[in-house]
Amino acid sequence: GLVGSEMCIRDRYRLKFEELFYVQLNILRYAKDRQRRYRGYIFEKVGDVFNTFYTKKLPFQLTGAQKRVLKEIRNDVGSGRQMNRLLQGDVGSGKTLVALMSMLLALDNGYQACMMAPTEILANQHCETIKELLFGMDIRVELLTGSIKGKRREAILTGLLTGDVKILIGTHAVIEDTVNFSSLGFVVIDEQHRFGVAQRARLWSKNIQPPHVLVMTATPIPRTLAMTLYGDLDVSVIDELPPGRKPIATVHQFDNRRESLYRSVRKQIEEGRQVYIVYPLIKESEKIDLKNLEEGYQHILEEFPECTVCKVHGKMKAAEKDEQMQLFISGKAQIMVATTVIEVGVNVPNASVMIIE
């Protein structure tokens, strides 16, 4: 009898293997087919813009990982096929810098570049960061979000058509029909899972040929899953932090240690740091979750009467949410109590602790 059951296990294993093998094979076939169908713009040269930035403007030495990823991107954009690459790296690993340098390659070859972020706050932050990095170089960078209207919007749209605007940064607003480029060659999409494939395709349709696409995410995605989810994307990983960045420590504590936890939070705030407190949506109903957040918020107000506490959750109106976020970003509020809506990424370099209830 034993032999029979062992055979059975092996047969099942074989069938499972075969099924997965064919899934992977199909994905690969799809990717190869895609590469044949979509020709990309060829960026032949590394020119003045890139070189000036590299020699004069780099805020710090690139890490080995950043150099490796840049090389992968340069190979892609010089190959004649359209690049579709997923760039994954922890918060603080320097993805934005790699994205910016890739965009400069497009500029060197006579194309425009565009960066799309999931929220206005994030788009604003990217725009400020990039303008700061390019300060003193003659490159017109513009921000386009839903709240930019009227004459200002018209001026940006005209600038895109004439080719004066070299880099456009924005939210979903950049894929509206009214937005047209003179020659869009490179697109960066931040936090992929907020944008569907259809939305990526809408950016391509703004051109005769599809631009090169770089997708950035801080969410670690296992390679096999990446293939299945984004079968059309090649994956690059930035797996080292810039010098001087401390790795992030994750600690699990039980409820009875709350007092000592709050003590260490106080210490951080006294040192001028800021703190996130996150109530993830675990319960089934949003009502209960909101109640948890509200109770947590009241509790934190009582615990930290000396602090300004702001709160953010998914049920708020966008304007209200932005106002609360601004309090935290500007440093006026020391503590932010939030649901997981903040996961899309806000850059608050001064925040040093995140407590997840």
Feature annotation, model-predicted:
Residues E19, A65, S260:
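Charged catalytic carboxylate motif
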Residues L15, E19-Y22, R68, E72, ...:
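Amphipathic alpha-helical interaction segments
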Residues G1-G4, I9, G64-V69, N75-G78, ...:
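Glycine-rich phosphate/oxyanion-binding loops and their immediately adjacent helices
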Residues R10-K16, K57-F60, A117, I121, ...:
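Generic amphipathic alpha-helical segments used as scaffolds and interaction surfaces in large
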Residues S5-E6, R10-K57:
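Upstream accessory/linker segments immediately N-terminal to the RecA-like ATPase cores of bacterial MutS
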Residues Y41-L86:
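Conserved pre-motif I regulatory segment
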Residues D11, G64, K287-K291:
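Ordered, soluble secondary-structure elements with a strong preference for glycine-centered loop motifs
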Residues Q82-E357:
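Inter-lobe coupling/hinge segments of SF2-like helicase ATPases
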